[in-house]
Amino acid sequence: MARTAVIAGVGPGLGESIARKFVDEGCQVGLFARSERYLDELSTDLGENVLAVPTDITDPEQVDEGFEAVREAFGPVDILVNHASGGSWKGLREISPEEFEDAWRVSSFGALCCSQAAVDDMLAENGGTIIFTGATSAVRGRDGALGFSAAKFSNRGMAESMARELGPEGIHVAHVVIDGQIETPRVEQQYPDRDEETFLDPDSVADSYWHLIEQDRSSWTLELDVRPHVEEF
């Protein structure tokens, strides 16, 4: 039986690669993002086992409606990837309270809304997987990125707390630290002379996400760090 996945905050780069990987592995996938045009283009490319659901994940009502649309199309949700992130790249003296709150709402509050919407399906099925997409800033606060760093630290704490709460119920919660820059068309334009080996390949990272989903219950990963082999850490 095909598994049903929701990717919350899909976009060009890693989110798109995760969606493609899940479809290739036989999943039925709900794609959440704000851009209806982008979602329509991506879902058309990926085929009939994909549902585009334009959603603002900071709005609990929209999130609930989005999950209900996925259930009606594909059935209960087995997999959730909390992938959305946001935040202006500003430090303490530049960031406004509104910008700080927006970073938290997109990354952390949105992840809360999506996790709450998915968890009952997983509990009813005695299993499931919830993955948080993190960043270097989740373990080492970045200078000049106060809102982003705070939100990513928050998500890491959420993942650890949820793993302890839900693990005994058969739900695998994992946090992925993306320790490096992901190669995307936009990044390639910004750094045309940069060595490709210094980038993370999004398709390879997506393979690592699928590995987390396939792990046996006797050997679950809580936190996974991924980085290019030349990345200093």
Regions found by a protein language model. Give the residues of each.
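Active-site loop of short-chain dehydrogenase/reductase
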Residues: 3, 76-77, 122-135, 168-172
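Conserved glycine-rich cofactor-binding loop
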Residues: 11-13
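Conserved glycine-rich Rossmann-like NAD(P)H-binding loop of the short-chain dehydrogenase/reductase
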Residues: 25-41
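The beta1-alpha1 cofactor-binding region of Rossmann-like NAD(H)/NADP(H)-dependent oxidoreductases
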Residues: 37, 55-66, 97
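Substrate-binding pocket helix/loop in short-chain dehydrogenase/reductase
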Residues: 91-92, 99-104
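Catalytic loop of short-chain dehydrogenase/reductase
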Residues: 131-154, 160, 164-167
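C-terminal helical subdomain
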Residues: 168-171, 175-177, 193-233
